[in-house]
């Protein structure tokens, strides 16, 4: 039995080592303080947890299965690949775990107007869904480029009664949508609650989103012990902002000496070309209220990120991932657009599961590693979402 890792972060100021924190304008200081205070109360309130657990079970469909992909494993000829099926959550991805938690907080705080940012549209759909469920006004900011790539999700949000506001600034993707949402929050601090979709932004968001997503890892730990009789050798998740990955990794951090934790970023067209691999190629900087590793030019200007998957197309990454990389508890690598497409194709043809392009980045790494490992080894992949939203891109790229 290897020694357990003792891990505790963030500190009371929201720092994960040198990362994280609250780099915010004065207009948001009270909002941030109120949010943190209310969250810490909710965190210790059994009634809050009971309400959330009930919704996760009866509305979202948790626990999601841990599925042994035996044909995919056989194809690779090595380790056994298991899939944590977050694609089976209501709305098609892990994002709803967090949206539900935050909307319950908004209700506790008496907020009536909800805003959110979205890249792939999955967080937008999840937020629109929970706002419809609770009868709250909802505005989602989305980059024009992402609106083009993710038309079905835009239609879903509108059908759910949400106003989708196109963002035409900058790269017209997730970074710009986030900036616009923060601007809205600064202009309407009293009545508005901002539901952040990933483990990014100022404290307490990275901690809060992690806590709401950690249900993924809690379930997986129990399921793999029940089904395989032991902990896995490797756990893999894709990393954009990083919420599905931190949700999976957090419960396994004490076991990091015996379980290898791997985060897979988007290498896009290649690490020397256009990509979104902030942990691999980024430098330390501040974006959206938090210190993190960022893609930036020689003058410190934030660069545009590129990935075939809209959900990984962010030039930064959650501060906790930066800290875990620095501590050596998680190892980060990257997968190109082409490799992700090939993995998506292979999973569809061997297991009958069409996953999201984001998740396909993790699947590719798992397939590659499985081929190099003995048959009795276990790799768990967080299959963070389903591929319905990506069919336009998939049809185009795979010439279907």
From Swiss-Prot:
Which GO terms label this protein's molecular function in UniProt?
Answer: tryptophan synthase activity
Q: Which reaction does it catalyse?
A: (1S,2R)-1-C-(indol-3-yl)glycerol 3-phosphate + L-serine = D-glyceraldehyde 3-phosphate + L-tryptophan + H2O
Superkingdom is Bacteria
Pathway assigned to this chain's UniProt record: Amino-acid biosynthesis; L-tryptophan biosynthesis; L-tryptophan from chorismate: step 5/5
Under which EC number(s) is this enzyme classified?
A: 4.2.1.20
Q: Which cofactor does it need?
A: pyridoxal 5'-phosphate
What's one GO-annotated cellular component?
cytoplasm
Q: Does the keyword Aminoacyl-tRNA synthetase apply?
A: no
* Entry keyword annotation includes Lyase: yes
* Annotated keywords: Amino-acid biosynthesis, Aromatic amino acid biosynthesis, Lyase, Pyridoxal phosphate, Tryptophan biosynthesis
Give the N6-(pyridoxal phosphate)lysine positions (modified residues).
95
Pfam families in the record, alphabetically? PALP (PF00291)
Q: Which InterPro entries would you find in this protein's record?
A: Trp_synth_b_CS (IPR006653), Trp_synth_beta (IPR006654), Trp_synth_beta/beta-like (IPR023026), TrpB-like_PALP (IPR001926), TrpB-like_PALP_sf (IPR036052)
Q: Which NCBIfam families match?
A: trpB
Q: Which family does it belong to?
A: Belongs to the TrpB family.
> What is known about its subunit structure?
Tetramer of two alpha and two beta chains.
Q: Which PANTHER family match?
A: TRYPTOPHAN SYNTHASE, TRYPTOPHAN SYNTHASE-RELATED
Q: What does this protein do?
A: The beta subunit is responsible for the synthesis of L-tryptophan from indole and L-serine.
What name does UniProt use for this protein?
A: Tryptophan synthase beta chain
Classification lineage: Bacteria, Pseudomonadati, Chlorobiota, Chlorobiia, Chlorobiales
